Amino acid sequence: MRINSLDALLHTVKDRPRKRLVVAWANDAHTLEAVSAAVEAGVVEAIVVGDEAVMTQVCQEHGLPKERFRMVHVATDAEAATRAVAMVRAGEADLLMKGLLSTDKYMRAILNKEQGLLDPGAILSHVTVMEHPGHPKLLIAGDVAVIPEPEFKEKAAILGYLVKVAKALGVETPKVAVLAASEQVLPKLSSSADAALLSKMADRGQIKGALVDGPMALDGALDPESARI
């Protein structure tokens, strides 16, 4: 079944066993409110790692039932990241979430060669799933958070992650637009040349399971009228 909205995604997840979510440094209202809503929706069981006194106070001030969370006390945000990652490694949690700590501390724990989460040689990237009222389907994009200037090998990995997520959402043959500043293939513009190469690799079966085209501009990828013009 293809999932075309975030509501449909939520309903699908509700029908499955709850995942165990661990949050690194859950010391703020926004984080605890979001996690509380996920617990209430029946999506996750929550472990929140942070300053227990602060988290308890936030729950009291914002009317959040403390019993929805398993609280793990640590003194610092860096320690929270390390502890949360360790819980995933040990099989005590299934999902990792960033709370109110800096991205560099969060990533440092994930990428730690001895105690992190990545296999040797693996590429860490980012995939986001979005809903737009003017578009009938979910939009899946990457990488917009982790790798600011990906090299070709990283772009190929990102494309693979996008396809994997799309298929998990029920898209049998995902259509992937590789974006660039120019829709012409310009050797001096690496983004356009890389996009063309990824497209050709898909044509030749080196990238499987998706229709890939590029280089493309964002408007042409999303709007049929723009593409026609």
Located regions from the model:
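Anion-binding alpha/beta catalytic cores of soluble intermediary-metabolism enzymes, centered on
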Residues: M1-I47, D51-I229
